[in-house]
From Swiss-Prot:
The protein's enzyme class: lyase
Biological processes, Gene Ontology terms: formaldehyde catabolic process
Source organism: Bradyrhizobium diazoefficiens (strain JCM 10833 / BCRC 13528 / IAM 13628 / NBRC 14792 / USDA 110)
Protein name: Glutathione-dependent formaldehyde-activating enzyme
EC number: 4.4.1.22
PROSITE patterns: CENP_V_GFA
Top-rank taxon, per record: Bacteria
Binding site for Zn(2+) 2: C48, C50, C53
Gene name in the database record: gfa
Length: 187
């Protein structure tokens, strides 16, 4: 039995244009959609297995990327946004009506990823943003109900479509976190 990873990757990766200038994210409401403008392309796009990220119906993973926070603007129906969990490091702003997470923001200025907002590229109304580059927090899908004996197949499928599976973030992002921590300790 094949597990649905995520609709945007189940049939393989669709490569980005390499020149994506940004676009508009729209929630899943039929009308009065929350719309969020994004300037520029995304970075560190990945499939995420954590239990905090928003996933479309039936998906095992979310697909999430980052953009500089100054490149994120709520365009329409911002009054429908609410923070999902005020105690979480990433303040996920979701539509109150449909539950779609529109962007996640870190307010702690000492956090290694402060200044980057987390978004779900599949919500772009436009095509061409960066394709997912890796899979993170893969083992965490067990916490959301995946059977442990399915994990080898999931990892194999991720590799087959071109996503290296990690049980944390990618090495480049882990290095960025460690560098931030080392600099903070040296200060």
């Amino acid at each position: 039995m094949t597990i649905a990873l995520h609709p945007s990757i189940d049939n393989g990766l669709k490569q980005g244009s390499g020149s994506f200038a940004g676009g508009t994210l729209a929630c899943k409401c039929k009308d009065h959609q929350v719309k969020v403008g994004i300037k520029g392309d995304v970075a560190h796009n990945h499939a995420c297995g954590c239990t905090k990220c928003w996933k479309p119906q039936g998906a095992t993973f979310s697909v999430v990327a980052v953009v500089p926070r100054q490149n994120v603007t709520v365009l329409e129906n911002g009054d429908k946004l609410e923070i999902v969990d005020a105690s979480a490091v990433i303040q996920r702003h979701a539509c109150k009506a449909c539950g779609t997470h529109m962007y996640g923001r870190i307010e702690n200025k000492n956090h290694p990823f402060y200044g980057l907002d987390f978004i779900h590229p599949e919500l772009f109304q436009e095509q061409g943003s960066q394709a997912p580059q890796f899979a993170a927090f893969v083992s965490s899908v067990i916490e959301s109900g995946v059977k442990p004996e399915q994990m080898a197949g999931i990892r194999s499928r991720l590799k087959e479509i071109g996503l290296e599976p990690y049980d944390c973030l990618s090495p480049a992002l882990m290095d960025a976190i460690a560098t931030h921590v080392a600099k903070a300790k040296a200060a």
